[in-house]
Amino acid sequence: MRLDKYLAETAQCTRSEAKTLLNRGRVTVNGAVCKKGETQLREGDSVAVDGAPLAYQQFVYLMLNKPEGVVSASTDKRDTTVVDLIGDAYPRRELFPAGRLDKTSTGFVLLTDDGGFAHEILAPKRHVSKTYTVVIDTPLTEEMRRGFVEGVTLADGTALSPAEVEALTPDGLTVKVRLRQGVYHQIKRMFGVYGAGVNALHRDAIGGLALDPALAPGQWRELSAEEVTAITTGA
C-alpha cells in the first residue's frame, strides 16, 4: 500500500492533508523521516506521525448506547441519527448501523463500515441473538411465555421463530426477551398478539456481547477484536 493512502486511512485525513504531513517531515517509516507519498509499505513496516505509531484498520466496529429520540440510520433530514452521534471521529469511514432500533427504543447499536460482517449478523441463517429488557403494560403470563417459545403467529399471519421471555420483576411487567430473528416492530407485535403493550424497550446484547455499562446514553467506543468475535461466537 502507498504511504499516502495508508496515512489517509489510518490517520483519518485526506490525501492532501497526508501530503502536508509528509512535506513537513512529521511522518516516519521504521524510525526514518519519509516525505514520499508514493513509498510502498511492506508487511511489518512501522509508520508514525509526530512519533505516535499508526495502526491500520480495515474496518471499524463501534458499540453505541442509543438514547431515546435518535433514529437508527446513517442520514435523516429531520432527526438526529446514530451516525450523527459519532461526530467527526471517522471522516473517511462510511459508517452505518448493523440492524436497527426504533426511535423510542434505547440500548446497544453496532456501527461499522464492514458490510460483510453486518450481513453475517443479520442473516436469518446465522441466528445471532439480540437480548432486550422490555417494560410491558400487562403482566407476563404463562400463555405468553409458552407462545414465545413455540413461535408466535402475528396478526398478519407471519409465523415467527421461537423466542425466549422471562420475568425480571415480581409483578411481571419488566421482562427479558431474546430473539434470533429481525422482523419490523417484532417485540411490540409479539406482545400485541396477547393484548399487551410495550412501554419501553432496551437492547442489552447482540450475540455474546453485552452493552458496556460504562457507556451513558449517547456514548460510544470501539470494539476490540475479541469483542467483535464474541458477537457471533456467543450468539
Language-model features: locations:
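Basic, flexible Lys/Arg- and Gly-enriched helix-loop patches that mediate nucleic-acid binding at interfaces
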Residues: 1-235
